[in-house]
């Protein structure tokens, strides 16, 4: 009687153990170790499958029953070019360094300076160049207008001869219309008083209004920037 009870108890224990393994295996399709919760393998390293195994739904890559699905490659990052932006710059060239007083022929030393400027203006990002001639207020308005035009064209032609494309350069004379030193300099000369000779006052006035005798080179350049859009990072 005692031996029979022991055998019955052992049978119940084995049955319970088998039920537990079967219950776990029915979910995973493989025989799983109750201690490590890992799939049991045979001596050949093969995974043990049970009667509940369904390869289509339960097959695992590590057991050779499924093929790993490669992760999709990240989409290429689109580089967006912004609309061109324009940068304007004015370079003022003193007529004193370019021409003699009341002259429209370039000084020898001015040639080298204009050659350096031409190299810069020949760059592909330079869209347009406007050469403006200016004079002081001395002399008639008509005379000053003509002088400013001649000087502007002399500078523009020199730049073209040094490699600046003629299609991007223009020249205009503005005469004395933008003279800025007139009133300031007249006030300064007046301070010399009655004792100063007329010639001295004229000399002082010519020197004072020198900044008005100039050639402005107005440059418009194109700046195009490439922008990489920021990726959206989703938080889980």
UniProtKB/Swiss-Prot annotation:
Its GO CC terms are: cell outer membrane; pore complex
Using the record's annotation, list all stretches that form the OmpA-like domain. Answer: 86-223
Where is the protein localized? Cell outer membrane
- Extract the ranges annotated as region (4 X 2 AA tandem repeats of X-P): 69-76
Cystine pairings recorded for this chain:
185-208
Major localization class: membrane
- Keyword annotations of the record: Cell outer membrane, Disulfide bond, Ion transport, Membrane, Porin, Repeat, Signal, Transmembrane, Transmembrane beta strand, Transport
Q: What is the topology of this protein in the membrane according to its UniProt annotation?
A: Multi-pass membrane protein
Q: Which SUPFAM superfamilies match?
A: OmpA-like
Instruction: List other remarks.
Output: PIII is closely associated with part, but not all of the PI molecules in the gonococcal outer membrane. A portion of the PIII is exposed to the surface in intact gonococci; the protein can be labeled with iodine and reacts with MABs.
Q: Which family does it belong to?
A: Belongs to the outer membrane OOP (TC 1.B.6) superfamily.
Name of the molecule in the record: Outer membrane protein P.III
Tell me which species this is from.
Neisseria gonorrhoeae
Higher taxonomy: Bacteria, Pseudomonadati, Pseudomonadota, Betaproteobacteria, Neisseriales
């Amino acid at each position: 009687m005692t031996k029979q009870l022991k055998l019955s108890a052992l049978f119940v224990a084995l049955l319970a153990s088998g039920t537990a393994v079967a219950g776990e295996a029915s979910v995973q399709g493989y025989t799983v170790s109750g201690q490590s919760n890992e799939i049991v393998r045979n001596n050949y390293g093969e995974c043990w499958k049970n009667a509940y195994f369904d390869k289509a739904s339960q097959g695992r890559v590590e057991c050779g029953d499924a093929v790993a699905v490669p992760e999709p490659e990240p989409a290429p990052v689109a580089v967006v070019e912004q609309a061109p932006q324009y940068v304007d710059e004015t370079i003022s060239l003193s007529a004193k360094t370019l021409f003699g007083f009341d002259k429209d022929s370039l000084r020898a030393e001015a040639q080298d300076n204009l050659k350096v400027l031409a190299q810069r203006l020949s760059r592909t990002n330079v869209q347009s160049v406007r050469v403006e001639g200016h004079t002081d207020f001395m002399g008639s308005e008509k005379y000053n207008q003509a002088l400013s035009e001649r000087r502007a064209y002399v500078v523009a032609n020199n730049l073209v001869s040094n490699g600046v494309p003629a299609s991007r350069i223009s020249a205009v004379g503005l005469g004395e219309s933008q003279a800025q030193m007139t009133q300031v300099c007249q006030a300064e000369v007046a301070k010399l008083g009655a004792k100063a000779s007329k010639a001295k006052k004229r000399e002082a006035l010519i020197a004072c209004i020198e900044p008005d005798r100039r050639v402005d080179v107005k440059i418009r350049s194109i700046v195009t920037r490439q922008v990489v859009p920021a990726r959206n990072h989703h938080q889980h």
